[in-house]
Amino acid sequence: MTIWLGSQPLVLASQSYARQMLLQNAGIPFEAIPAAIDERGVQQASGLTSPAEIAARLAEEKALAVSQRLPGRLVLGADQTLALGERTFNKPADRAKATAQLRTLSGRRHELHSAIALVRNGKTVFAETSVARMTMRQLTEAEIEAYLNEAGDAATSSVGGYQVEGLGVHLFDGIHGDHFTILGLPLVPLLNYLRQQRLLAF
């Protein structure tokens, strides 16, 4: 028996390993087809400044881009932004930028805004955005250096320079919010919608 009642697998418009694992662990069959969109360009063209709205727009644009190539398929787009006050962060391009981000976040509380959008035939049928609040402990230069040495590529593959599901958890004093939101996919609202659409067995 499979939990999924859809005639075709869900399409995930992302190459995020964390998002893929969340869907896999929830028993949702999917095909990962990353959306090739210019995220910075979309953000600038939108004129949006709210981290939550930026995440929502990018999630929708990713799903729309993939939906155009796959008529009839249900496509899931997702995005996450990190905000420290009015300032938003992108994935650090290299180790030096990861170091700078961690220095800035050290000893302060920031927010992770995670958004999802479900699109079919170019139309958004469901969208959700949620927030988690993360308090990073005061880090010394030696601790930042040691963390980056151990984290390797994980430090430049996630916004903020950390993956909380891995070694990044050592950087925090407090975490407030949904675990799935922190990992970049508000899973419970997604499952609730799929259940309402009779796409899940229970």
UniProtKB/Swiss-Prot annotation:
GO terms, biological process: nucleotide metabolic process
Cofactor(s) for this UniProt protein: a divalent metal cation
Name of the protein described by the UniProt record: Nucleoside triphosphate pyrophosphatase
CDD domains linked: Maf
Species of origin: Rhodopseudomonas palustris (strain BisB18)
EC id: 3.6.1.9
Compartments in which it is found: Cytoplasm
Active site (UniProt): D79
Chief location category: cytoplasm
Keywords, sorted A to Z: Cytoplasm, Hydrolase, Nucleotide metabolism
Family designation: Belongs to the Maf family.
Catalytic activity as recorded in UniProt: a ribonucleoside 5'-triphosphate + H2O = a ribonucleoside 5'-phosphate + diphosphate + H(+); a 2'-deoxyribonucleoside 5'-triphosphate + H2O = a 2'-deoxyribonucleoside 5'-phosphate + diphosphate + H(+)
GO cellular component: cytoplasm
HAMAP family: Maf
Top-level taxon of the source organism: Bacteria
PANTHER family in UniProt: BIFUNCTIONAL DTTP/UTP PYROPHOSPHATASE/METHYLTRANSFERASE PROTEIN-RELATED, BIFUNCTIONAL DTTP_UTP PYROPHOSPHATASE_METHYLTRANSFERASE PROTEIN-RELATED
Top EC class, one word: hydrolase
InterPro entries tied to this protein: ITPase-like_fam (IPR029001), Maf-like (IPR003697)
Protein task: Nucleoside triphosphate pyrophosphatase. May have a dual role in cell division arrest and in preventing the incorporation of modified nucleotides into cellular nucleic acids.
Molecular function terms from GO: nucleoside triphosphate diphosphatase activity
